[in-house]
Amino acid sequence: MKKRILSLLMTLCVAVCFVPTLAFADETPTQTVVTIDVGGENVENTDYKIDDTRIILRTKDKVLYELTGTTDKKISVWGSNNAADIDQAFYIKLNDVTVNGGIVVENSPVKMVIDVPTGTTNKINRVSANDLTIKGSGTLNASDLSVTQKTSYMPSALHITDTTINVTCPSNKYSEFNGPCVLDGSANVTYVGGGLYAPLHVGEKSGDTTHSLTLKDNAKLYCLQDDMETPASASVNGLEIFNAPLLLEGNSYLEAEGKDSTSKYKGCGLISQNNITVKGNAAIKATGYDVGLSTAGNLEVNGGKIIAKSKDSNGIVAANVTIKNAEAEVEGYWPALYGSSAVSIENSKVTAKANDVAIYSPDKVAITNSIIKATSPDGCDGIRGNNGTTVSGSWIETSGDETFADAPDSITDSVLFNGKTGKTIGNHQIPGDVTVEKDMKLDIAKDTSITVPDKKTFTNHGKIDVKGSFAKEDGGTVICDSHSGGTATCVKKATCDVCKAEYGDIDASNHEGLKHVEAKAATKDQEGNIEYWYCEECGKYFADKAGEKEIAQADTVIAKLPADPAADQNAGTKKKDSSASTGDDSNLALWAALILLSGCAAGGTVLYRRKQN
């Protein structure tokens, strides 16, 4: 039993010992570093030779050549005609070296791996190989960097990782990529043309079905012109892609520019015979005097951004144009965005401007949950599909008068601006950040609505008339500096129909709480009042129902009626006898009083006469 356990442990140890060998089997083989001062004296050994005209590298795989110094000589390398040797490579490390003669493949295809260490700046006038790998975060300057065309037994390939490469082409030269070509990491590659040719051709070898160009991670590729202000004598494009699909993904970036020309043929920014695909956060900028971005295949943008502009032609030309979850800025003299088979825009923001229809297909145009701004001259539609344009859930600003109301066109749950005047169709939820500019007017019709959802912003600088409804969901943002709607009262400012903020001044004449009080006659016991109106909001009194004739509260009061004095005195001398007086008793008392009064008067007269006598 112990022997069996010991045997298992020994087997495990042996397996572990071989792990490093297996893991790194495909990586750089064990090598001897051979340092060469390229400006050094003539010398010859088994690994290299320096003579009066050149430097010859002799050993593949087993040697890492570290190059330093400066020379006008060329470096010569030889490949092999033996198919079994195609995986053998020359390994070269650049250490602030200048080789004005370049690295020249003298015969047969060559595989080459070049290391450009961080912090180094190097110049190799010409670099080419059938299978070329360049890595390291340093800088390499050249006048030509190419992947040559495949042979019967060695395919072409390119892989650039992290390196900054600047290629300035002579006026009569261009560089080419063949086979599968990949730029990744932080590769930053710039080609500048000399004025007669596109600086970079991709997939030039006919019959090779392996051609492709892929940009990944943060890789960048620039195909520029030496002098954009001076026209060429013929068409000079920025980047020419033949039988090779183009793929950008991650945060990669491609920029290409075409030149003006004194001939009738101008330069395109990017011209391709195959499909172009943009994913993630990648971006393409293509500008030219002919088409900005032209492909005989399909253009598919799923994420990222496209900028394509032309002075004298279309911004984008492709068979099928599909823009999804992306942003596009397109300008042209002819239709800025042209899809010969179809144009489909979904969850995207597209700005298109042309001296013709801005967004056009001879077949169909479909726009879904997108923001579109299409600008064309007077008399032109901004957006047109000859076999129908369908719009759904989108914010459309077009300079044309198209309504999409008649078949085969259709529009649902959208906002449509024709020029500066817009309206809602159905119930629209904005698909992204939108703005009503200062000179724009939007009518939200009855039974229609606009909703601002989470993480979206609605900005209003213009005029909005809300007869339907405007709502903001949690997380949505409304920015409004041009308020409208609502009603001011005697105590409150108006509330904006859009942002729900109070604005303006109070309206002292608008009394929403005006209460009518009917007139009431006064009595001896209670005051009365005139007819009047009282505002419960501001506490004021008015003599009219319009609330225009303000009065004091005291003016509404009618005083009590005055009291009767005689009635008050009689009330104080009433008999305590509970029996009612008769009319006879009353007359008897009256006569008795009169007799007594007459007697007194007669007595007074007799007494007066006696005294006279």
Model-derived regions, located:
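Bacterial N-terminal signal peptides
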Residues: 10-20
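Short, hydrophobic alpha-helical membrane anchors of single-pass surface/secreted proteins
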Residues: 5-7, 585-596, 606-607
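Sec-dependent signal peptide cleavage junction
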Residues: 18-30, 577-588, 606-610
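C-terminal membrane-anchoring or membrane-association module
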Residues: 598-613
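A composition-driven surface/loop motif
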Residues: 8, 24-481, 498
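Ser/Thr/Gly/Pro-rich low-complexity, disordered linker/stalk segments of secreted
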Residues: 467, 473, 561-580
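Extracellular modular ligand-binding repeats in secreted and cell-surface proteins
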Residues: 480-572
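Positively charged n-region of N-terminal signal peptides that target proteins for export
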Residues: 1-5, 10, 609-613
